[in-house]
Amino acid sequence: MEHTFEALGLRAALVTALAEQGITAPTEIQQKMIPEILSGKDVIGRSETGSGKTLAYLLPIFEKLDLSIRGTQAIILTPTHELAAQVYHQAELLQENAGIAAGCVLLIGAAGIGRQLEKLKAKPRIVVGSVGRILDLIRKKKIQAHLVRTIVLDEGDRLMDDGNVEDVAAVIKTTLKERQIVLLSASVSGEAKAKAAAMMKADAVDLEAKSGGIVPKGIHHYYILSAHREKFA
Protein backbone atom coordinates (compact mmCIF):
# COMPACT_ATOMS: atom_id res chain seq x y z
CA MET A 1 0.00 0.00 0.00
CA GLU A 2 1.30 3.43 -0.99
CA HIS A 3 1.70 5.68 2.06
CA THR A 4 1.17 9.10 0.52
CA PHE A 5 -1.38 11.85 1.03
CA GLU A 6 -2.37 11.57 -2.63
CA ALA A 7 -3.21 7.89 -2.12
CA LEU A 8 -5.52 8.88 0.74
CA GLY A 9 -7.65 10.91 -1.66
CA LEU A 10 -6.51 14.45 -0.91
CA ARG A 11 -6.37 17.12 -3.60
CA ALA A 12 -3.03 18.42 -4.85
CA ALA A 13 -3.48 21.82 -3.18
CA LEU A 14 -3.63 20.21 0.27
CA VAL A 15 -0.60 18.03 -0.44
CA THR A 16 1.31 21.14 -1.51
CA ALA A 17 0.19 22.95 1.64
CA LEU A 18 1.53 20.11 3.78
CA ALA A 19 4.85 20.23 1.94
CA GLU A 20 5.07 23.92 2.88
CA GLN A 21 5.06 22.75 6.51
CA GLY A 22 7.67 20.10 5.80
CA ILE A 23 5.13 17.27 5.97
CA THR A 24 5.50 14.79 3.12
CA ALA A 25 4.08 11.49 4.42
CA PRO A 26 1.05 10.65 6.57
CA THR A 27 1.39 9.29 10.09
CA GLU A 28 -0.34 6.06 11.10
CA ILE A 29 -3.39 7.79 12.58
CA GLN A 30 -3.72 9.93 9.44
CA GLN A 31 -3.52 6.86 7.20
CA LYS A 32 -6.29 5.20 9.18
CA MET A 33 -8.61 8.14 9.80
CA ILE A 34 -8.56 10.23 6.63
CA PRO A 35 -10.25 7.63 4.36
CA GLU A 36 -12.92 6.88 6.98
CA ILE A 37 -13.73 10.56 7.51
CA LEU A 38 -13.83 11.14 3.75
CA SER A 39 -16.30 8.25 3.45
CA GLY A 40 -18.64 9.98 5.91
CA LYS A 41 -18.31 7.45 8.73
CA ASP A 42 -18.45 8.46 12.39
CA VAL A 43 -15.02 7.80 13.89
CA ILE A 44 -13.40 7.30 17.28
CA GLY A 45 -9.64 7.71 16.91
CA ARG A 46 -6.98 7.07 19.54
CA SER A 47 -3.37 8.07 19.16
CA GLU A 48 -0.76 9.58 21.42
CA THR A 49 0.14 13.26 21.59
CA GLY A 50 2.29 14.42 18.68
CA SER A 51 1.02 11.77 16.28
CA GLY A 52 -0.76 14.15 13.91
CA LYS A 53 -4.37 13.87 15.10
CA THR A 54 -5.23 17.48 14.25
CA LEU A 55 -4.37 17.07 10.57
CA ALA A 56 -6.06 13.65 10.60
CA TYR A 57 -9.40 15.45 10.79
CA LEU A 58 -8.59 18.89 9.33
CA LEU A 59 -7.41 17.48 6.00
CA PRO A 60 -10.61 15.55 5.20
CA ILE A 61 -12.69 18.48 6.45
CA PHE A 62 -10.95 20.75 3.94
CA GLU A 63 -11.26 18.11 1.22
CA LYS A 64 -15.03 17.83 1.75
CA LEU A 65 -15.84 21.55 1.99
CA ASP A 66 -18.44 22.80 -0.46
CA LEU A 67 -17.13 26.25 -1.35
CA SER A 68 -20.38 27.07 -3.15
CA ILE A 69 -22.15 27.13 0.23
CA ARG A 70 -21.48 29.90 2.72
CA GLY A 71 -21.98 28.96 6.35
CA THR A 72 -20.65 26.58 8.97
CA GLN A 73 -19.96 23.11 7.56
CA ALA A 74 -17.60 21.89 10.32
CA ILE A 75 -17.54 22.53 14.07
CA ILE A 76 -14.44 21.58 16.06
CA LEU A 77 -15.02 21.44 19.81
CA THR A 78 -12.17 21.47 22.34
CA PRO A 79 -12.08 21.35 26.16
CA THR A 80 -9.61 24.25 26.48
CA HIS A 81 -9.11 27.65 24.91
CA GLU A 82 -5.43 26.87 24.32
CA LEU A 83 -6.18 23.77 22.25
CA ALA A 84 -8.84 25.65 20.30
CA ALA A 85 -6.29 28.33 19.42
CA GLN A 86 -3.76 25.71 18.27
CA VAL A 87 -6.31 24.00 16.03
CA TYR A 88 -7.49 27.33 14.62
CA HIS A 89 -3.97 28.42 13.73
CA GLN A 90 -3.32 25.09 11.97
CA ALA A 91 -6.55 25.49 10.01
CA GLU A 92 -5.58 29.05 9.05
CA LEU A 93 -2.14 27.87 7.92
CA LEU A 94 -3.67 25.07 5.88
CA GLN A 95 -6.12 27.32 4.07
CA GLU A 96 -3.44 29.91 3.37
CA ASN A 97 -0.91 27.43 1.98
CA ALA A 98 -3.54 25.49 0.02
CA GLY A 99 -5.22 28.59 -1.37
CA ILE A 100 -8.61 27.33 -0.19
CA ALA A 101 -10.87 30.15 1.00
CA ALA A 102 -12.55 28.06 3.67
CA GLY A 103 -13.10 30.82 6.18
CA CYS A 104 -12.17 29.85 9.75
CA VAL A 105 -13.16 31.47 13.03
CA LEU A 106 -12.07 30.94 16.64
CA LEU A 107 -14.89 31.14 19.20
CA ILE A 108 -13.82 30.99 22.84
CA GLY A 109 -15.09 32.49 26.07
CA ALA A 110 -11.80 34.27 26.77
CA ALA A 111 -12.33 36.64 23.82
CA GLY A 112 -14.88 39.39 23.33
CA ILE A 113 -18.11 38.17 21.79
CA GLY A 114 -18.60 41.37 19.78
CA ARG A 115 -15.59 40.73 17.58
CA GLN A 116 -16.61 37.10 17.16
CA LEU A 117 -20.09 38.12 16.01
CA GLU A 118 -18.51 40.38 13.40
CA LYS A 119 -16.40 37.49 12.08
CA LEU A 120 -19.46 35.23 11.91
CA LYS A 121 -21.11 37.69 9.52
CA ALA A 122 -18.61 36.49 6.91
CA LYS A 123 -20.20 33.01 7.22
CA PRO A 124 -17.02 30.98 7.86
CA ARG A 125 -17.19 27.32 6.91
CA ILE A 126 -15.03 26.05 9.79
CA VAL A 127 -15.73 26.99 13.41
CA VAL A 128 -13.26 26.11 16.16
CA GLY A 129 -13.81 26.76 19.84
CA SER A 130 -15.04 25.97 23.30
CA VAL A 131 -18.30 24.10 23.78
CA GLY A 132 -20.00 26.76 25.90
CA ARG A 133 -19.35 29.67 23.55
CA ILE A 134 -20.33 27.73 20.42
CA LEU A 135 -23.54 26.44 22.01
CA ASP A 136 -24.41 29.97 23.11
CA LEU A 137 -23.92 31.32 19.59
CA ILE A 138 -25.96 28.50 18.05
CA ARG A 139 -28.81 29.29 20.44
CA LYS A 140 -28.52 32.95 19.49
CA LYS A 141 -28.85 31.77 15.85
CA LYS A 142 -25.48 33.24 14.93
CA ILE A 143 -24.27 29.85 13.67
CA GLN A 144 -26.37 27.98 11.10
CA ALA A 145 -26.27 24.52 12.66
CA HIS A 146 -28.42 22.95 9.92
CA LEU A 147 -25.51 23.35 7.47
CA VAL A 148 -23.04 21.46 9.68
CA ARG A 149 -21.71 18.26 8.10
CA THR A 150 -18.96 17.31 10.55
CA ILE A 151 -18.51 17.78 14.30
CA VAL A 152 -15.09 17.03 15.78
CA LEU A 153 -14.59 16.33 19.48
CA ASP A 154 -10.87 16.97 20.02
CA GLU A 155 -9.58 15.52 23.30
CA GLY A 156 -12.92 13.76 23.31
CA ASP A 157 -12.31 11.95 26.58
CA ARG A 158 -12.43 15.32 28.36
CA LEU A 159 -15.44 16.48 26.36
CA MET A 160 -17.28 13.37 27.54
CA ASP A 161 -16.77 14.18 31.23
CA ASP A 162 -19.61 15.37 33.46
CA GLY A 163 -18.65 19.03 33.05
CA ASN A 164 -18.93 19.02 29.25
CA VAL A 165 -20.99 16.13 27.93
CA GLU A 166 -24.41 17.79 28.30
CA ASP A 167 -23.33 20.85 26.31
CA VAL A 168 -21.64 18.65 23.69
CA ALA A 169 -24.86 16.67 23.30
CA ALA A 170 -26.81 19.93 23.04
CA VAL A 171 -24.56 21.16 20.21
CA ILE A 172 -24.96 17.87 18.35
CA LYS A 173 -28.76 17.94 18.73
CA THR A 174 -28.93 21.29 16.91
CA THR A 175 -27.49 19.68 13.76
CA LEU A 176 -29.10 17.34 11.25
CA LYS A 177 -29.01 13.59 11.87
CA GLU A 178 -26.92 13.01 8.75
CA ARG A 179 -23.97 14.92 10.19
CA GLN A 180 -20.72 13.15 10.97
CA ILE A 181 -19.11 12.94 14.43
CA VAL A 182 -15.38 12.42 14.90
CA LEU A 183 -13.84 11.93 18.34
CA LEU A 184 -10.09 11.95 18.94
CA SER A 185 -8.00 11.51 22.03
CA ALA A 186 -4.77 10.01 23.29
CA SER A 187 -6.90 7.52 25.22
CA VAL A 188 -10.62 6.95 25.62
CA SER A 189 -12.12 5.29 28.70
CA GLY A 190 -14.88 2.75 28.37
CA GLU A 191 -17.33 5.22 29.89
CA ALA A 192 -16.35 8.01 27.49
CA LYS A 193 -16.57 5.63 24.53
CA ALA A 194 -20.07 4.55 25.57
CA LYS A 195 -21.23 8.16 25.84
CA ALA A 196 -19.76 8.99 22.44
CA ALA A 197 -21.22 5.88 20.82
CA ALA A 198 -24.69 6.92 21.99
CA MET A 199 -24.31 10.10 19.91
CA MET A 200 -22.91 8.35 16.83
CA LYS A 201 -24.32 6.20 14.06
CA ALA A 202 -24.39 2.43 14.53
CA ASP A 203 -21.63 1.84 11.95
CA ALA A 204 -19.08 4.14 13.65
CA VAL A 205 -15.50 2.90 13.38
CA ASP A 206 -13.02 2.65 16.26
CA LEU A 207 -9.39 3.22 15.23
CA GLU A 208 -6.13 3.17 17.14
CA ALA A 209 -2.60 4.05 16.08
CA LYS A 210 0.15 2.50 18.14
CA SER A 211 3.21 4.05 16.53
CA GLY A 212 5.12 6.85 18.20
CA GLY A 213 4.51 10.54 17.73
CA ILE A 214 6.12 12.88 15.24
CA VAL A 215 7.50 15.41 17.70
CA PRO A 216 11.28 15.47 17.14
CA LYS A 217 13.47 14.40 20.04
CA GLY A 218 15.52 17.19 21.57
CA ILE A 219 13.10 19.91 20.49
CA HIS A 220 13.29 23.08 22.57
CA HIS A 221 10.08 24.62 23.91
CA TYR A 222 9.71 28.32 24.72
CA TYR A 223 6.91 30.28 26.33
CA ILE A 224 6.09 33.93 26.94
CA LEU A 225 4.28 35.16 30.03
CA SER A 226 1.46 37.58 29.27
CA ALA A 227 -1.58 39.08 30.91
CA HIS A 228 -4.76 37.00 30.55
CA ARG A 229 -6.45 39.68 28.44
CA GLU A 230 -3.60 39.56 25.92
CA LYS A 231 -3.63 35.84 25.24
CA PHE A 232 -6.33 35.81 22.57
CA ALA A 233 -6.33 39.33 21.17
Label for each model-derived stretch:
Residues G218-A233:
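Conserved interdomain hinge at the start of the Helicase C-terminal
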